[in-house]
């Protein structure tokens, strides 16, 4: 009788981490990492059941932060540094949702890339 025994993987306890928030025009992606950049947890508005234009709403960003931070708290994350990027309207509500999660925030950094006359912007929308 050969039985295979599955060993449960130990969860690492990480107390200090970085939150990367990418707020684009179409979606919000949140990633919790440790200091070295190894992913602890991640979530996106599209992965949380929001489809189409609803992915780019501030409420979708709030739900995304809640889901990702719940996973990160299981690993013992308490102190975070925030790196937020992108042109989306969800930035402010994502920050407020993070402050409501009882993390100790050490720094907030805006890592949005600024084009120095880069690619041509999309044409104007006609409704």
Swiss-Prot record:
GO cellular component: ribonucleoprotein complex; ribosome
Keywords attached to this entry: Ribonucleoprotein, Ribosomal protein, RNA-binding, rRNA-binding
Molecular-function GO term, any one: structural constituent of ribosome
The keyword Ribosomal protein is assigned to this record: yes
Coiled-coil intervals: none
Family annotation (PROSITE patterns): RIBOSOMAL_S11
A biological-process GO annotation: translation
Lineage top rank: taxon: Bacteria
Similarity-based family: Belongs to the universal ribosomal protein uS11 family.
PANTHER family in the record: 40S RIBOSOMAL PROTEIN S14/30S RIBOSOMAL PROTEIN S11
Role of this protein: Located on the platform of the 30S subunit, it bridges several disparate RNA helices of the 16S rRNA. Forms part of the Shine-Dalgarno cleft in the 70S ribosome.
Alphabetized HAMAP family for the sequence: Ribosomal_uS11
Quaternary state and interactors: Part of the 30S ribosomal subunit. Interacts with proteins S7 and S18. Binds to IF-3.
Name of the protein described by the UniProt record: Small ribosomal subunit protein uS11
Species: Rickettsia akari (strain Hartford)
Lineage: Bacteria, Pseudomonadati, Pseudomonadota, Alphaproteobacteria, Rickettsiales
Gene: rpsK
